[in-house]
Design a protein with these regions (language model features):
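Short, glycine/charged-rich "phosphate-handling" switch motifs in NTP-dependent
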Residues: 90
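Charged docking surfaces used in two-component/phosphorelay signaling
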Residues: 5-13
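C-terminal output helix
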Residues: 97-106
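Acidic, metal-coordinating helix/loop segments flanking the phosphotransfer/catalytic sites
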Residues: 20-39
Length: 112
């Protein structure tokens, strides 16, 4: 799956509530104003503030430090996974996202 609308539809059909943000700054504001968010899916390529910067900013906030973050990225070159994990991702999935793989990762991180 490549786009946010397809991804949101799959998750909503499985009973999940999906909140979306168009930029890294919006994502941080959304997380700060919605304390019951259980997990974040983070695109690396975003305007204003990319996913790496956004994850660093999230991890600097004590109330969000333990929030599971799954990085979703078309960047699948050698070293990209490590860069995502170093920036604060809990998990890394390359696009196009395999639905079963994403659901498995969500189950893993939501049930910790």
């Amino acid at each position: 799956m490549r786009n946010i609308f397809a991804l949101s539809s799959v998750l909503e059909r499985r009973g999940m509530t999906v909140l979306t943000a168009g930029t890294g700054r919006q994502a941080i504001e959304l997380l700060e104003s919605t304390p019951d968010v259980a997990i974040a899916l983070m695109d690396i390529m975003m305007p204003e503030m990319d996913g790496y910067e956004t994850m660093h900013a999230i991890r600097r906030q004590s109330q969000l430090r333990r929030l599971p973050i799954i990085a979703l990225t078309a960047k699948a070159m050698k070293g990209d996974r490590e860069k995502c994990l170093e920036a604060g991702a809990s998990e890394y999935l390359a696009k196009p996202v395999n639905t079963d793989q994403l659901l498995s990762a969500l189950r893993t991180w939501l049930h910790r």
